[in-house]
């Protein structure tokens, strides 16, 4: 059987180990070829090929439900659930998603993009199953660092308290998240990897004991206590943590040995109550370059399969915002030992790996634990440090209570640096950084800013470090800057709450925030070609808003347009409209940004065009709103 013939995972039933191994090779080939051509996540999926095949051969997927954590592990799952012929559309507009979406396929039982959600979801399904009197297996596959997330531990704590609820948790332990795992839990799991299989000892000890003449049967009542003692000898001195939490622990199992995996899963299905199967895998398995560089090959842009090197673009690009951010932060940290960079398992993505390499004592990686990262930063701030929490916009959502309760209510000087703010592209709706303006703007005490380009971002990094009155946040986008000149030192902080006028005109006031400032200027030039002259403001700050600049100009010009790369509901445009109403300035305000929709996976340019956020579309929308007679000139 060839992989292309598999349209339903139950077709794996009855296949021999040799046939499954052939399917495994074909999955890796297809996975590698697709990611090499189009980009995507590489290492996580390559590491779970045998795990997926072994697990699915022991389940009835017409009935049983498998919940995958951090959906980028699930590329093999997609390939054996009817998406082989569409796999070349991975992460592309109108193609299949890079993560899991309930609406994409009947075997995607729960959406996944952020980490640590699978056990909670699977437990909820298991409880509903029991309440409804149904019969199916609920399985959570968690790994790639997700077990370090507090939500996963909360779910384990709950599930372990339900001894009659059948739940299978499969731990894909590849010793990594995106970067190497950090913390006590990964260290404990590493010790478990080196220990003999616990379940084997428990099961075989009793069988061997009973064969001792005259003694075995008579001491049978004591076997339980003896087995518990043997179990503790078989695992690290930390104790059989999962067993103590109410789970039957099995493993560690070789995650690339199909015979061992199938036998273990078959045995696990026979055990009542919550079970955890610990599977030791190699991230990037089957592609030598990915096995050697598990961080670099976690996810890739298009690359040459032979050399492993990224395919160069046709023209050189300006530096990425994240690179400029990290370079500037390192320069400042070299001069100020109180600056502490904090990441939640995203050192490479945020650029804080550069701080780690240069100043390791001024760097903290907390693992996939955004809530802890924020309150840790608050504690550092209490003692006079300058914590810089570099967290993707989409992941900071997970620490909302901590932002309010632990930082803003106490007015602590934590500097939040929100990478990947705005439209992020092929990762899709789970990763779009659309909401941070709205969800932060309503919190007292916080200052919020966004740079128009990479040079202004350097000044904002200095501003954030020097602002010690309370919390401050800077959002910046994924991708490259504009190529403007950068400075190596001597950056001046910005005045808090002050914007700047970039262009003067009497017909319309355009106020851009962050990444939409340059499109504002471009739209103004297009409008000028049609006889419409715009004043353009770079707001710089949404909180506090520069009302001294904006309100008089709005009153004078009488037509206002706001531009933002974020949700318009409660966003920057709402802040401007509220300020004008509060000042009793009643003028029309056209808010342009991301409407009340989910932005699906596509390139950022494709998404912006679909949302009407290109400079030409902006000019057209301004003309439609305020200068109707001239619309046809642009169309």
Curated annotation (Swiss-Prot):
GO cellular component: cytosol
Residues that, per the record, bind thiamine diphosphate: 72, 113-115, 145-146, 174, 287, 370
Gene Ontology BP term (one): 1-deoxy-D-xylulose 5-phosphate biosynthetic process
InterPro entries linked to this entry: Dxylulose-5-P_synthase, THDP-binding, Transketo_C/PFOR_II, Transketolase-like_Pyr-bd, Transketolase_BS, Transketolase_C, Transketolase_CS
The protein's required cofactors: Mg(2+); thiamine diphosphate
Assigned keywords, A-Z: Isoprene biosynthesis, Magnesium, Metal-binding, Thiamine biosynthesis, Thiamine pyrophosphate, Transferase
Entry keyword annotation includes DNA-binding: no
Positions of Mg(2+) binding: 144, 174
Pfam families recorded: DXP_synthase_N, Transket_pyr, Transketolase_C
Gene3D superfamilies according to UniProt: 3.40.50.920, 3.40.50.970
Comment on bound cofactor: Binds 1 Mg(2+) ion per subunit.
GO molecular function, one term: 1-deoxy-D-xylulose-5-phosphate synthase activity
EC number of the protein: 2.2.1.7
Pathway linked to the protein: Metabolic intermediate biosynthesis; 1-deoxy-D-xylulose 5-phosphate biosynthesis; 1-deoxy-D-xylulose 5-phosphate from D-glyceraldehyde 3-phosphate and pyruvate: step 1/1
CDD domains, per database record: TPP_DXS (cd02007), TPP_PYR_DXS_TK_like (cd07033)
Enzyme class: transferase
Catalytic activity: D-glyceraldehyde 3-phosphate + pyruvate + H(+) = 1-deoxy-D-xylulose 5-phosphate + CO2
Family: Belongs to the transketolase family. DXPS subfamily.
Role summary: Catalyzes the acyloin condensation reaction between C atoms 2 and 3 of pyruvate and glyceraldehyde 3-phosphate to yield 1-deoxy-D-xylulose-5-phosphate (DXP).
Oligomer and partners: Homodimer.
Protein name: 1-deoxy-D-xylulose-5-phosphate synthase
The organism of origin for this protein: Trichormus variabilis (strain ATCC 29413 / PCC 7937) (Anabaena variabilis)
């Amino acid at each position: 059987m060839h992989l292309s013939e598999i349209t339903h995972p139950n077709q794996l039933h009855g296949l021999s180990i040799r046939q499954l191994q052939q399917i495994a090779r074909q999955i890796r080939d297809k996975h590698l070829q697709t990611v090499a051509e189009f980009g995507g996540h590489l290492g996580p999926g390559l590491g779970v090929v045998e795990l997926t095949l072994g697990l699915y051969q022991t389940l009835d997927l017409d009935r049983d439900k498998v919940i995958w954590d951090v959906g980028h592990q699930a590329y093999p799952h997609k390939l054996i659930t009817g998406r082989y012929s569409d796999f070349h559309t991975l992460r592309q507009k109108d193609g299949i998603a890079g993560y899991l979406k309930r609406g994409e396929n009947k075997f995607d039982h729960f959406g996944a993009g952020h980490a640590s959600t699978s056990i909670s979801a699977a437990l909820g399904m298991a409880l509903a199953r029991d309440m409804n009197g149904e019969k199916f297996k609920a399985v959570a596959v968690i790994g790639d660092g997700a077990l370090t997330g507090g939500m996963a531990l909360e779910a384990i704590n709950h599930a372990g308290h339900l001894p009659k609820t059948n739940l299978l948790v499969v731990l894909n332990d590849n010793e990594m998240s995106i970067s190497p795992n950090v913390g006590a839990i990964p260290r404990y799991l590493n010790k478990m990897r080196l220990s003999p299989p616990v379940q084997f000892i428990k099961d075989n000890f009793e069988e061997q004991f009973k064969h001792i003449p005259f003694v075995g049967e008579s001491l049978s009542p004591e076997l339980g206590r003896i087995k518990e003692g043997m179990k503790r000898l078989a695992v690290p001195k930390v104790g059989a943590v999962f067993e103590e939490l109410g789970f039957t622990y099995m493993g560690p199992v070789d995650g690339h040995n199909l015979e061992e995996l199938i036998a273990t899963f078959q045995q696990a299905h026979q055990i009542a109550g919550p079970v955890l199967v610990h599977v030791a895998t190699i991230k990037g398995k089957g592609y030598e370059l990915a096995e050697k560089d598990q961080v670099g090959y976690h996810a890739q842009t298009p690359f040459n399969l032979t050399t492993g090197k990224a395919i160069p673009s046709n023209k050189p690009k300006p530096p990425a915002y994240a690179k400029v951010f990290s370079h500037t932060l390192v320069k400042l940290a070299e001069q100020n030992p109180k600056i502490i960079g904090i990441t939640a398992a995203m050192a490479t993505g945020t650029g804080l790996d550069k701080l780690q390499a240069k100043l390791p004592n001024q760097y903290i990686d907390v693992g996939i634990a955004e809530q802890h990262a924020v309150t840790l930063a608050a504690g550092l701030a209490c003692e006079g440090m300058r914590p810089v929490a570099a967290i993707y916009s989409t992941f900071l959502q997970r620490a909302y209570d901590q932002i309010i309760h632990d930082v803003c209510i106490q007015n602590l000087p934590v500097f939040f640096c929100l990478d990947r703010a705005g439209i992020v592209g092929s990762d899709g709706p789970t990763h779009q950084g659309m909401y941070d303006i709205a969800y932060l703007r309503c919190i007292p005490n916080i200052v919020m800013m966004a740079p128009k380009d990479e040079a202004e971002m350097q000044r904002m990094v200095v501003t954030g470090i020097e602002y010690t009155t309370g919390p401050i946040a800077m959002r910046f986008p994924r991708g490259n800057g504009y190529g403007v000149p950068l400075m190596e030192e001597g950056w001046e902080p910005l005045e808090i709450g002050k914007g700047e006028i970039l262009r003067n005109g009497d017909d319309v006031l355009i106020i851009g925030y962050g990444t939409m400032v340059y499109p504002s200027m471009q739209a103004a030039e297009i409008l000028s070609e049609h006889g419409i002259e715009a004043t353009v403001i770079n707001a710089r700050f949404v909180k506090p808003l520069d009302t001294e600049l904006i309100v008089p100009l709005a009153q004078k010009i009488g037509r206002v347009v706001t531009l933002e790369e974020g949700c318009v509901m409660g966003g920057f445009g709402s802040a401007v409209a509220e300020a004008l109403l509060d000042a009793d300035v009643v003028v029309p305000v056209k808010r342009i940004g991301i409407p009340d929709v989910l932005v699906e996976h596509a390139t950022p340019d494709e998404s912006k065009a679909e949302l009407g956020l290109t400079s030409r579309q902006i000019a057209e929308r301004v003309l439609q709103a305020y200068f109707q007679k001239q619309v046809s000139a642009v169309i």
